[in-house]
């Protein structure tokens, strides 16, 4: 089997680890298109190694710099720009599977385009299903497109369901709890971006690392699981599991529970999504269960981590609210990373956006984009108002 792939977000954490998987594939995975946001220098280095047919960049100026550098090196690889450019990379005829590894709701358009083009989707961009889960899954069914999860938790559930009777009792999503899982509510008001970026277990990009620290990431994953596995919110539970060894669990109607275990290494679910239904040998470190300390689980504290409850509330409400919640969170997280607001301002801004939004029950894609844009404007205004920036 040779699979031809496009990687949207190739210079990010998931994108770089996807290329590590490609490197070990012995030619069974080939890169046809690479896309990034603004890091044209790293994308140039990747192009020199993997020689894709097409390159895409979100930012126009970065695309111009990349095109100039490619011309100077005698590499006749076309460069396209913007969201339309990402969609063009995703829809390239020579591509079999699209790895959507971009961060944020910007992944929605290219993912939908890839689905309409009949491409298999290796989904690492959870915001796509958060913002437009019903529309995305309906399009995938209509086009008979397979969506394979890359998130470790959803990959774990997907693996546990293979060959099983689908009469489920519940899904159990595990969360490391992030770097602040044992901090008091008072202490959370003082944490800095540098504190939040020190994740104890996983190697991830900055936005998702902050979401992990606030437990917003787990709330987004609850919504993603609802749509990927067609299960009610009442049947999805979140447990804090500090060791990050059990990646998620499935409880069946008879009370049996299956789990998928392994070291916290994103290359494993990435490879599984790209090679499914096969399993390829790896040379990466493996879990030695005899050397593993006790595995512990506890329920999350929603008072200290209100973002989790906000996300689940948005998911239960549905309609346009998940897109608003997600967009407001993106703005707030980037403001926190820039030291413009405090950590606990993130859920405050998200809550205010959700409360102010004029809800739509069944938005189409343009309406979802409008809700997203409104929430970004609203959250941006709130960033400049009353805040508790850490010293």
From Swiss-Prot:
EC numbers on record: 1.1.1.267
Pfam families reported in the protein's UniProt record: DXP_redisom_C, DXP_reductoisom, DXPR_C
Pathway linked to the protein: Isoprenoid biosynthesis; isopentenyl diphosphate biosynthesis via DXP pathway; isopentenyl diphosphate from 1-deoxy-D-xylulose 5-phosphate: step 1/6
Cofactor(s) required for function per UniProt: Mg(2+); Mn(2+)
Catalysed reaction, written as an equation: 2-C-methyl-D-erythritol 4-phosphate + NADP(+) = 1-deoxy-D-xylulose 5-phosphate + NADPH + H(+)
Binding site for NADPH: 11-14, 37, 39, 125, 127, 205
Residues the record lists as binding 1-deoxy-D-xylulose 5-phosphate: 126, 152-153, 176, 199, 212, 217-218, 221
Entry keyword set: Isoprene biosynthesis, Manganese, Metal-binding, NADP, Oxidoreductase
Binding site for Mn(2+): 151, 153, 221
GO MF annotation terms: 1-deoxy-D-xylulose-5-phosphate reductoisomerase activity; manganese ion binding; NADPH binding
Keyword Transmembrane helix appears in the UniProt entry: no
Homology family: Belongs to the DXR family.
Function of the protein: Catalyzes the NADPH-dependent rearrangement and reduction of 1-deoxy-D-xylulose-5-phosphate (DXP) to 2-C-methyl-D-erythritol 4-phosphate (MEP).
Protein name, entry field: 1-deoxy-D-xylulose 5-phosphate reductoisomerase
């Amino acid at each position: 089997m040779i699979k031809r792939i496009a990687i949207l977000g190739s210079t990010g954490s998931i994108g770089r680890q996807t290329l590590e998987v490609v490197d070990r594939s012995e030619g069974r995975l080939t890169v046809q298109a690479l896309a990034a946001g603004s890091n044209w220098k790293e994308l140039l280095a990747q192009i020199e190694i993997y020689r894709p047919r097409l390159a895409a960049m979100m930012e126009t100026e970065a695309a111009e710099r990349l095109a100039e550098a490619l011309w100077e090196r005698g590499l006749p690889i076309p460069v396209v720009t913007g969201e339309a450019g990402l969609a063009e990379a995703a829809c390239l005829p020579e591509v079999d599977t699209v790895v959507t590894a971009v961060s944020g709701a910007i992944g929605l358009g290219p993912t939908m385009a890839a689905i309409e083009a009949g491409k298999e989707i290796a989904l690492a961009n959870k915001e796509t299903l958060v913002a437009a889960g019903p529309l995305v899954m309906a399009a995938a069914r209509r086009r008979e497109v397979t969506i394979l999860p890359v998130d470790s938790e959803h990959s774990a559930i997907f693996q546990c369901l293979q060959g099983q009777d689908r009469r489920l009792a519940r899904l159990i999503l595990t969360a490391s709890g992030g770097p602040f899982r044992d901090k008091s509510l008072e202490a959370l008001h003082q944490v800095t971006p540098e504190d939040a970026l020190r994740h104890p277990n996983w190697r991830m990009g900055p936005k998702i690392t902050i979401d992990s620290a606030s437990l917003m990431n787990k709330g987004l994953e609850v919504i993603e699981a609802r749509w990927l596995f067609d299960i009610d919110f009442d049947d999805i539970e979140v447990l804090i599991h500090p060791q990050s060894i059990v990646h998620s669990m499935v409880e069946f109607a008879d009370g049996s529970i299956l789990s998928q275990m392994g070291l916290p290494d994103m290359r494993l679910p990435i490879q599984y999504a790209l090679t499914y239904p096969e399993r390829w040998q790896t040379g990466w470190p493996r879990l030695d269960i005899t050397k593993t300390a006790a595995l512990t689980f506890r329920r999350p504290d929603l008072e200290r981590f209100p973002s989790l409850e906000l996300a689940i509330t948005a998911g239960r409400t549905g309609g346009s609210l998940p897109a608003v919640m997600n967009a407001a969170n993106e703005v707030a997280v980037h403001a926190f990373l820039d030291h413009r607001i405090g950590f606990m301002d993130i859920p405050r801004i998200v809550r205010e956006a959700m409360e102010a939004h004029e809800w739509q029950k069944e938005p189409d894609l343009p309406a979802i984009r409008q809700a997203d844009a409104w929430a970004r404007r609203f959250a941006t205004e709130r960033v400049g108002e009353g805040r508790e920036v850490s010293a």
